[in-house]
From Swiss-Prot:
Catalysed reactions, semicolon-separated: Release of an N-terminal dipeptide, Xaa-Yaa-|-Zaa-, from a polypeptide, preferentially when Yaa is Pro, provided Zaa is neither Pro nor hydroxyproline
Stated family: Belongs to the peptidase S9B family.
InterPro entries: AB_hydrolase_fold, Peptidase_S9_cat, Peptidase_S9B_N, Serine_Prot_S9B/DPPIV
Residue ranges that the UniProt entry lists as topological domain Cytoplasmic: 1-92
Pfam families xrefs: DPPIV_N, Peptidase_S9
Protein name: Probable dipeptidyl-aminopeptidase B
Higher taxonomy: Eukaryota, Fungi, Dikarya, Ascomycota, Pezizomycotina
Keywords: Aminopeptidase, Glycoprotein, Hydrolase, Membrane, Protease, Serine protease, Signal-anchor, Transmembrane, Transmembrane helix, Vacuole
Membrane topology: Single-pass type II membrane protein
GO biological process terms held by the UniProt record: proteolysis
Gene name per UniProt: dapB
This protein's record includes keyword Magnesium: no
Length: 919
């Protein structure tokens, strides 16, 4: 399960531009801390009891008629002749009375409308005055237009980022990068030397790999959607007609372009229209391994024929590509194929899904299967059967196999002390030298790690390291693919091969160096009450430097550091004197890097040159000038970063206050969360998202707190949630909300919480645990409601199997419908074709609500939408609904419809008001 990419960053190949000036964002950002020890709840003020009916006097003329009853009235016009002669005057009196009654009724109706809503302020208007709370920093003085939801959804607030493709030169030259998107004079696809861009004579000239963005094959125009140059830069692999499969996987038609002749041919000349799932260059640039119909093939460029590596792949057997659950929860990618460094071997997964149960996903509008229905069957939904293992059900059986390129032979290596087939998850494969490969595996519940060393030449293997993480701190092993091989170099003090891994150390995740490869003992490179992130980023083998990103300054920040390979002389490379959030991508030889500053001010990117302890800025390639202009023109919320202490744990929090915040007023508060294990929502990246829109345009306060279970606050706080998802996380949200409810500028009668995916689960779990005491409203999108319904690999990592932890699954399930009924109202939305968090979750919840006679909720489904809810304008609609629903909640509308009472029509009231009108 991954957080929804609601405000995803753009990352694209763009022509690199020269340096431009950049100004800081005008968002105000301050820091403070708050503890439960200083919490003094204020006087509780009950919400006005309004049910939407008009208070009427106990008078017969206003009572409702029983069914079939007719009121008796005297005739208005007498039958006598005397009465007839005075008809004109009587008519005038009649119409005067009618107009007076009608006017009185309209006045009463208007008073009802205004009076019934007088206690429900809209946005930040009509807020009650209270004393200011100045403990949390300054208020916003930014001016300008409010942020619009349309801007957020259209990505207008997304920073512009460049993804540079660093490549090694044919002779292992450093500082070369691939650029895509130039004009015909520059060439569409080029390899540039960063030194040449700065006018350095030592730089290589730019080399054009593709002159035009379109190539022709047998008279057919091929428009590639992505490109991959060969390591020797003499060929380019192209993909066209790309189609998405799952989150990371896709298929397409592949082509090989010759750089010198600018001509292309199909990857498989015998099947040019075949759809390929994966294609990877050989390190020797002389071959491409690819997957089609779940089988592996090898195309040597010296021949037009292809070599069949596997033959039995199909519906239940996958070779070289992951199945759904491995793609989503283990690899986070579309490839489980790895070339050895010398191009002599290929390692790949064989995934057997035969025993995995299927789950049907229905599509009512589209037909993603691509199959045309038979005549007469057009009105039936397209059904996609997914092999989806749920907790306790059979998992796919994954084996590591190898292919000897020269011998054209597939083989496996048996290893003693390996996990059983039904208890093995392979999380990483890393080639070393001389045909050796490191394999990291865990048991099914992901709390025992085993590292194996396999020798493909001798076809032997052994266990070299084992860690009982559950016994260490009750935690789990998070899958990652960041382990780095360190080759031996006696001249630089490395007599043996080794590798750098991330391991738990004194309660935090840190870098450890293992050498030789079969050593179980590590040299710790980092330590302290902070953590490394997806490390190492790069290793300078000549100078013995390890570069990495870490949270040493604060959990919400990311800075770039370097440390010697012996663990000494750790230093930051980025400016740590002020808050910052950086990312980095190093060149092949680590002499250069793309440094990306993501916040809190306006993001920028620069090419830097590394010189050991120092960095030199070579070229500013992006300063997001357009974003700077928008920041100056719009009123952004004030962001206040704080620490809160709950049960002795220090948690990270950000409060977004509306522009022109007035501490003398009372504001509604929306809590936003994700909260999944190891995740992080509170960080220092520049972000203008839905929460920013809520604060800027709607005038509400938005609070986000990363509770226990989230990442980068230490393993003690993270691992406590294992086996009981939702309990501590919800407790932390409620405890923090009580702190905010006690603040002088918060309207404690108007507090809501919302989230998507795991955040949707957390919204419902918080409402359930809170039972209306703190939060009155909630909005849950695509929520898990019972962890038995989610996939096995993710769930069992944090919950064990249902067989081992039945009570934990019972406790984490949304079951207390009476508690949910105590909130004023909540909203649930779900994509009907969600392949990740199945619609089953919401449907079972609705059944429980029905059985408990609970009606205080709204429900919305989106046909054919998956977990991201995008199909047919659904993404816009889901956020429109969130916005409107929230406004109605804080306006008090859901109180008005809580207990509906029939209301008389205007005509019926008029008739009883003037009984003489009707004989």
């Amino acid at each position: 399960m991954r957080p929804s990419d609601d405000h995803g960053e753009t990352s694209e190949f763009l022509p690199i531009t020269r340096s431009r000036s950049v100004s800081a964002a005008s968002q105000t950002s301050t820091d403070s801390s708050l503890s439960t020890e200083s919490l003094f709840p204020g006087e509780q003020k009950p919400f006005p009891n309004v049910n939407g009916t008009m208070a009427l006097a106990d008078d017969d003329q206003y009572r409702d008629l029983e069914d079939g009853e007719v009121e008796q009235t005297e005739p208005f016009l007498a039958s006598s002749k005397k009465a007839a002669t005075g008809g004109g005057r009587a008519r005038r009196i009649f119409w005067i009375l009618v107009l007076l009654c009608l006017g009185g009724w309209l006045l009463a109706f208007a008073l009802f409308l205004t009076g019934g809503r007088a206690n429900y302020q809209t946005a930040s208007d009509a807020l009650q005055a209270h004393g200011a709370d100045s403990a949390l920093g300054s208020t916003s003085t930014s001016s300008g237009k409010p942020v619009t939801l349309q801007q957020v959804l259209a990505g207008q607030w997304n920073p512009r980022y460049h993804a540079i493709g660093w490549v090694a030169g044919p002779n292992n030259e450093d500082g070369l990068l691939v650029e895509k998107g130039g004009d015909e004079k520059q060439g569409y696809l080029r390899v540039d030397d960063i030194r040449s861009r700065k006018g350095n004579d030592t730089g290589r000239e730019s080399r054009v790999l593709m002159w035009k963005p379109i190539v022709h094959v047998d008279g057919k125009a091929i428009v590639p959607s992505n490109v991959w140059p060969s390591p020797d830069l003499k060929k380019v692999l192209l993909i066209s007609e790309q189609q998405k499969n799952w989150r990371h996987s896709f298929t397409g038609k592949y082509w090989v372009l010759d750089v010198d002749s600018q001509t292309a041919q199909p990857l498989d000349p015998s099947a040019p229209d075949g759809r390929v799932q994966l294609a990877l260059w050989s390190p020797a640039s002389d071959a491409v391994v690819f997957v089609r119909d779940n089988n592996l093939y090898l195309r040597r460029l010296s021949s037009d024929s292809v070599v069949v590596i596997t033959k039995d792949g199909g519906e239940n057997l996958f070779y070289g590509v992951p199945d759904w659950v491995y793609e989503e929860e283990v690899i986070s990618g579309n490839s489980v194929t790895w070339w050895s460094n010398d191009a002599k071997y290929i390692a790949f997964f064989r995934t057997n899904e035969t025993s995995v149960p299927e789950f049907p996903v229905q599509y009512y509008i589209s037909r993603p299967s691509g199959k045309k229905p038979l005549p007469g069957l057009e009105n039936y939904p397209d059904v996609r059967e997914i092999k989806y293992p749920k907790p306790g059900a059979p998992n796919p059986v994954v084996d590591l196999q190898f292919y000897d390129v020269d011998k054209n032979e597939v083989f496996s290596v048996e290893v003693a002390d390996d996990f059983a087939d039904d208890d093995r998850i392979i999380i990483e494969v890393l080639w070393a030298s001389e045909g050796k490969v490191l394999v990291r595996s865990t048991n099914r519940e992901s709390d025992i790690l085993k590292v194996y060393l396999i020798d493909t030449k001798s076809r032997t293997g052994k266990l070299v390291r084992s860690e009982d993480v559950a016994g260490l701190d009750g935690g789990w092993v998070e899958p990652s693919q960041s382990t780095r091989f360190i080759p031996a170099d006696p001249n630089n003090g490395r007599p043996h091969d080794g590798y750098i891994d991330t391991v738990p150390y004194n309660g935090y995740d840190h870098l450890a160096y293992f050498s030789p490869l079969d050593s179980p003992n590590a040299l710790m490179l980092t330590s302290g009450e902070w953590e490394v992130v997806d490390a190492p980023a790069a290793v300078d083998l000549q100078r013995g430097l390890v570069y990495f990103v870490g949270t040493r300054e604060a959990p919400t920040q990311r800075h770039v550091y370097r440390v010697q390979l012996d663990g000494s002389n750790l230093k930051p490379l980025t400016d740590t004197s002020k808050p910052g959030y950086y990312d980095v991508s190093f060149s092949h030889g680590t002499g250069y890097a793309l440094l990306t500053y993501k916040g809190p001010s306006i993001p920028w990117q620069a090419i830097i040159k590394t010189q050991g302890d120092e960095i030199t800025y070579e070229d500013r390639i992006e300063d997001n000038a357009q974003l700077t202009k928008m920041v100056e023109a719009y009123a952004l919320p004030t962001e206040i970063y704080q620490n809160v202490t709950v049960d002795g744990y220090t948690l990270q929090l950000v409060e977004r206050r509306p522009p022109h915040f007035n501490p003398a007023k009372k504001y509604p508060v929306l809590f936003y969360l994700y909260g999944g294990p190891g995740s992080q929502t509170v960080d220092r990246k520049f972000t203008v998202d839905f929460q920013s829109y809520v604060a800027s345009s709607l005038g509400y306060i938005v609070v986000t707190v990363d509770g226990r279970g989230t990442g980068f606050i230490g393993r003690k706080a993270r691992c406590i949630v294992r086996g009981n998802l939702g309990f501590y996380e919800a407790h932390d949200q409620i405890a923090t909300a009580k702190m905010w409810a006690a603040k002088s500028y918060v309207d404690e009668t108007r507090m809501a919480i919302w989230g998507w995916s795991f955040g949707g689960f957390m919204t419902l779990k918080t409402l359930e645990q809170d039972a209306g005491q703190t939060f009155q409203y909630g909005m849950a999108v695509a929520p898990v409601t019972d962890w038995r319904f989610y996939d096995s690999i993710y769930t069992e990592r944090y919950m064990h199997t249902p067989q081992h932890n039945p009570s934990g699954y019972d406790n984490s399930t949304i079951t207390d419908m009476a508690a949910l009924s105590e909130s004023v109202r909540f909203l649930v939305m779900h994509g009907a074709s969600d392949d990740n968090v199945h619609l089953q979750n919401t449907l079972v919840l609705i059944d429980k609500l029905d059985l408990s006679n609970v009606e205080n909720y709204d429900l919305q489904f989106y046909p054919d939408s998956d977990h991201s809810i995008y199909f047919h304008n659904a993404h816009t609609m889901v956020y429109d609904r969130l916005s409107d629903w929230l406004v109605n909640a804080f306006n008090g509308e859901w109180h008005l419809i809580a207990k509906p009472v029939p209301d008389e029509s205007m005509w019926e009231r008029m008739k009883r008001s003037l009984p003489l009108l009707y004989p």
